[in-house]
A protein has these predicted regions:
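Extended ligand-binding clefts on enzyme/binding-domain cores
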Residues: 217, 280-291, 301-396
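Well-ordered alpha-helical scaffold segments within catalytic/enzyme domains
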Residues: 114-128, 169-181, 225-241, 288-306, ...
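Active-site acid/base region of carbohydrate-active enzymes
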Residues: 125-137, 196-198, 228-284, 338-345
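Low-complexity, Ser/Thr/Pro/Gly-enriched N-terminal "stalk/linker" regions
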Residues: 24, 32-161, 185-186, 190, ...
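Aromatic-rich carbohydrate-recognition surfaces in CAZymes
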Residues: 161-261, 286
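Long, well-ordered core segments of solenoidal/helical folds
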Residues: 134-150, 180-202, 246-266, 316-334, ...
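N-terminal Sec-pathway targeting helices
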Residues: 15-32
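Acidic/His metal-coordination segments adjacent to aromatic residues that form catalytic metal sites
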Residues: 150, 202-218, 263-281
Length: 402
């Protein structure tokens, strides 16, 4: 809440969010374009094959296996695949299977033209051609992964063809800040439909909205990420119609987030984006709830009525308590995974812009954590993965914070 969370919240002032959120939409879109694995850190078994790409239309998604991708490349600004022999492979509208046509196949070129028009209707950020290409590719894949009804799949494989609330929230945020608010609203509409009565979400859902019954407990960070995404998708509350439609979802989530803050000012222990059972509060959950409470308080300021005003004050106070506890409990150790340690955690990137106000101590912790988690030029999420392969979402989170 502004630059001094505790003080501002104590005085119930409106959160001053706009000044530090409208930054680097490229990095945000890249984070989300490749964040499909963020909520899918575990699978029931090792997948026998990873997809090299995806083809799709509004109704069907098809993975491109690596053994079929040799020498292939997507046409610029589209999901039409040019094979090594020059032929074009794509999924026509309404088709159930990919079609392979000649190099100038009119159907393929029409699909590519429509996708380029969709990109042009928004913004494709980036300072260089390579950055713009990465952002465009991410946005096109996000568009494909958002299924009819707004289900934003984590990936097009049997292991991850589900909706994780945090993945979907980041997807909605990326689509919103790049000018594709209709798609962002659809994603948030799906999340609204899968929200539980207590304001929480299942750890993941099927594309038809049914919860996945695999024994995973609810992950509390969803009650932070969804309000944050709703705030961005509604143009920070300026789209009053969308803000009004999402208000019941935001209200229930933020009420639960505020009620979850314990006497120590922190949320309870529980799984976060690592999807592991925890014995102590994690930085990832605390950062998500802090972003969500700030965003919800801002949205409440634009709502009519005494009840909304009371909630704004309550959520701002909860954000102030949480921010103070994060600084007091996590700060002395350099913002590690747990208050008592636990090693570096990429979630430190979620404490500063564009999720929260600038803080020199947080900025220093981000730089230190990056150095400790860097592997082969990228980043792993935390200590357990040191020596392993970098994670794109963790790496992109540091890029966003840079």
């Amino acid at each position: 809440v502004g630059g001094d969370d505790g003080g501002a919240a104590t005085k119930d002032r409106e959160p001053k969010l706009r000044r530090w959120v409208d930054r680097r939409p490229l990095a945000l879109s890249v984070v989300v374009g490749l964040v499909a694995l963020l909520g899918a850190t575990r699978a029931d078994r090792s997948p026998p094959l990873f997809a090299a790409g995806v083809l799709g239309n509004r109704d069907v998604l098809v993975s491109v296996p690596p053994d079929q991708a040799g020498g292939a490349a997507y046409l610029e600004g589209s999901t039409v695949l040019r094979l090594g022999d020059g032929r074009l492979r794509y999924l026509p509208p309404g088709a159930a299977e990919p079609v392979t046509g000649p190099p100038e196949d009119p159907g393929a070129l029409a699909v590519a033209a429509e996708e380029r028009a969709w990109l042009a209707a928004g913004t494709v950020p980036g300072a260089t051609a390579a950055e713009r290409d990465a952002a465009a590719r991410s946005l096109l894949f996000l568009r494909l992964l958002v299924r009819p009804g707004g289900a934003a799949l984590a990936a097009q494989t049997p292991y991850w063809a589900y909706v994780w609330p945090r993945d979907a929230s980041f997807t909605a945020a990326a689509l919103a800040v790049t000018g594709h608010r209709r798609e962002a609203a659809a994603v948030l509409g799906f999340l609204a439909g899968t929200q539980r009565a207590d304001g929480t979400w299942p750890a993941r859902s099927h594309p038809d909205g049914r919860p996945v019954s695999d024994g995973r407990p609810a992950q509390l960070d969803a009650v932070g990420w969804v309000p944050w995404a709703a705030w961005l998708a509604s143009d920070q509350g300026r789209d009053t119609d969308l803000a009004a439609r999402l208000w019941p979802t935001v209200r229930a989530a933020a009420d639960h987030a505020a009620a979850s803050i314990g006497p120590d000012g922190l949320p309870p222990a529980g799984p976060d984006y690592w999807e592991r059972q925890e014995r102590a509060p994690t930085l990832g959950t605390a950062a998500a709830l802090l972003a969500g409470l700030r965003a919800a308080s801002h949205l409440a300021a634009a709502r009519p009525g005494r009840a909304a005003e009371e909630r704004r004050h309550r959520w701002a106070r909860a954000a102030g308590r949480l921010a103070g506890a994060v600084a007091a409990r996590f700060g002395p150790g350099g913002y590690q995974r747990h208050p008592a340690g636990g090693g570096p955690d990429a979630a430190v990137t979620w404490l500063g812009p564009p999720f929260g106000p600038p803080d020199p101590a947080v900025a220093q912790a981000v730089r230190t954590t990056w150095r400790r988690l860097t592997v082969a030029g990228g980043s792993v999420p935390g200590r357990p993965w040191l020596g392993g392969d970098p994670w794109t979402p963790a790496t992109a989170s540091f890029a966003l914070a840079a």
